[in-house]
C-alpha cells in the first residue's frame, strides 16, 4: 500500500462538474489500495475575486484580515471535494491548514512553513479515510493567527504534507499533461518531458515556468520527494521530477526546454562610485525593501570619472518599492540617476547537457538575432542561459530558441483549461 499525496489546482475544481470528476479520480486511487491525502486550491478565480472584494471595502486591507478572508476559498473547495467523495461511497475528512498542523512564520501574505505536525491526519488515515487539506494556509507559530503562504502556496502545502507523512509520491494535477519543453500555449509542438531533475526544474521555475512554483520544487528537493505532474483531465502519465543532474551522464546532449517570464522589471543605477562597498549599499537598500533580485549586471567602470552602472531585475510587483527605496537613499549611496523599465521579458534555455557542449551560447544568440530579437542583458549558470528582451518580442524569442535547438515533438500539445495553476 502506497501513501499518495494529490494536489488539484483551481481550474481542476472550478465548478461542481469538475469537483465530481476530481472526486472520482481520488476515489479510484483509494480503491487501488492507497492511502490518499489531497490538497486543493480555491475554486477557479475565487482568490482573485476575494482580493477584489477586499479592495472595494478597504483600499489597503490589514494583512491579518486579508489572510482570514483569502483562506476561506480553500476551505470551501476542500469541503466540497470531501462531500463529493462521500457521495461516491468513500469516507473523507477535510482539515484547514492549522488543523493539519501546518506551522508557519508570522508574515501575512507570504508565510514560510516551519514545521508540519500531522497527527490528526495520521489518525484519519488509520481510520481508512481520504484526508483533505486546505492548501495555501497555515498558522503562525508565534501569534497563532491564520497565515497564507503566497504564490504557489498550495503546491508547497502538498509537498510539505508528502514530506511530513513520508509519502511515496506527490502528484500535482493541473490543466496540461505534464512539464513541456516550452509553454504549449506559445509553442504548439512543445514536447512533454518524461522526467526532469530537481536542478533543472528549479531553473525552469525560477525562469518563469508556471507548472511548478520555485518554493515547491525547493521543498521537494530538500526532502527528496518525487513530484509527478499530471493533467486532471486525462489519464496520461505526465512528468516525474526526481533525481539530480549528477546522475545525468556529462556527455549526454540533453537540453530540457525553454522557459519565459513576463513578470519582471529592470532597474538601473547610473553613475555609482566604482569603489568597494557601494554595490553593497545598493543591494542592502533593495533587501531592506523586501525585494528579491534575479539577474545582476555591472558595467565596466568609466576610467575618466571612476563611475559604473549596475542593472538588476526583480518582480514587476515590487519594482516600484525598490525604486522608491533607492531614490530615498540617492545622496547617501551617491549615484546620479535611476532608470526603471517594466516592458521587458526574460527567455531562458535550460538543460544539463550544456555543461559539456560549448556551442550552446553561440547558437542561442544566433537564433535570437535571426528573428530580430535584441539581447539587453545575459546571465548564465551551469545549466541555464537567460536573456532579457522587449516584452513584445518574448513569444517570438521562445519559438526561435525552441526551433533552433530541435526541442519540438511530433504531436501538438494539449491544453485543457485555465492557465496551468
From Swiss-Prot:
Binding site residues for ATP: 7-10, 41, 174-175, 180-185, 210
Positions contributing to substrate binding = 25-30, 45-49, 74, 125-126, 151-154, 274, 292-294, 298, 360-361, 374-375, 381-382
The coiled-coil regions, if any, are none
Xref: Pfam families = AA_kinase, ACT, ACT_9
Name the UniProt record assigns to this protein = Aspartokinase
- For whether the record's keyword set contains Transferase, the answer is yes
Q: To which pathway does this protein belong?
A: Amino-acid biosynthesis; L-lysine biosynthesis via DAP pathway; (S)-tetrahydrodipicolinate from L-aspartate: step 1/4; Amino-acid biosynthesis; L-methionine biosynthesis via de novo pathway; L-homoserine from L-aspartate: step 1/3; Amino-acid biosynthesis; L-threonine biosynthesis; L-threonine from L-aspartate: step 1/5
Amino acid at each position: 500500500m502506497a501513501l499518495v499525496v494529490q494536489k488539484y489546482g483551481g481550474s481542476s475544481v472550478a465548478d461542481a462538474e469538475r469537483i465530481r470528476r476530481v472526486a472520482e479520480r481520488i476515489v479510484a486511487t483509494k480503491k487501488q489500495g492507497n492511502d490518499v491525502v489531497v490538497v486543493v486550491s480555491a475554486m477557479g478565480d475565487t482568490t482573485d475575486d476575494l482580493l477584489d472584494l477586499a479592495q472595494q471595502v478597504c483600499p489597503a486591507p490589514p494583512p491579518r484580515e486579508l489572510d482570514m478572508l483569502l483562506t476561506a476559498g480553500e476551505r470551501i473547495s476542500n469541503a466540497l471535494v470531501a462531500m463529493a467523495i462521500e457521495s461516491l461511497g468513500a469516507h473523507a475528512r477535510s482539515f484547514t491548514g492549522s488543523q493539519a498542523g501546518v506551522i508557519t512564520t508570522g508574515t501575512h501574505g507570504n508565510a514560510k512553513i516551519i514545521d508540519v505536525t500531522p497527527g490528526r491526519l495520521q489518525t484519519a488515515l488509520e481510520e481508512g479515510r481520504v484526508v483533505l487539506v486546505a492548501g495555501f494556509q497555515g498558522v503562525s507559530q508565534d501569534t497563532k493567527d491564520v497565515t497564507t503562504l503566497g504564490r504557489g502556496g498550495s503546491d508547497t502545502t502538498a509537498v510539505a504534507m508528502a514530506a511530513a507523512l513520508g509519502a511515496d509520491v506527490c502528484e500535482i494535477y493541473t490543466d496540461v499533461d505534464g512539464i513541456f519543453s516550452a509553454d504549449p500555449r506559445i509553442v504548439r509542438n512543445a514536447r512533454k518531458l518524461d522526467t526532469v531533475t530537481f536542478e533543472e526544474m528549479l531553473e525552469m521555475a525560477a525562469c518563469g515556468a508556471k507548472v511548478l512554483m520555485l518554493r515547491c520544487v525547493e521543498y521537494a528537493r530538500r526532502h527528496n520527494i518525487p513530484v509527478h505532474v499530471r493533467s486532471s483531465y486525462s489519464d496520461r502519465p505526465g512528468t516525474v521530477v526526481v533525481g539530480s543532474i549528477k546522475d545525468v551522464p556529462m556527455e549526454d546532449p540533453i537540453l530540457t526546454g525553454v522557459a519565459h517570464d513576463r513578470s519582471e522589471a529592470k532597474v538601473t543605477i547610473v553613475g555609482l562610485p566604482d569603489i568597494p562597498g557601494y554595490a553593497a549599499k545598493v543591494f542592502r537598500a533593495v533587501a531592506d525593501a523586501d525585494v528579491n533580485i534575479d539577474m545582476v549586471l555591472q558595467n565596466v567602470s568609466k576610467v575618466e570619472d571612476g563611475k559604473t552602472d549596475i542593472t538588476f531585475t526583480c518582480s514587476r510587483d515590487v519594482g516600484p518599492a525598490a525604486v522608491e527605496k533607492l531614490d530615498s537613499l540617492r545622496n547617501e549611496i551617491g549615484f546620479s540617476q535611476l532608470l526603471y523599465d517594466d516592458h521587458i521579458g526574460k527567455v531562458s534555455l535550460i538543460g544539463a547537457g550544456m555543461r559539456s557542449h560549448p556551442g550552446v551560447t553561440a547558437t542561442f544568440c544566433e537564433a535570437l538575432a535571426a528573428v530580430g530579437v535584441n539581447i539587453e542583458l545575459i546571465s548564465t549558470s551551469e545549466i541555464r542561459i537567460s536573456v532579457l528582451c522587449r516584452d513584445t518580442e518574448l513569444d517570438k524569442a521562445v519559438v526561435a530558441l525552441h526551433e533552433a535547438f530541435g526541442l519540438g515533438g511530433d504531436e501538438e500539445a494539449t491544453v485543457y483549461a485555465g492557465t496551468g495553476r
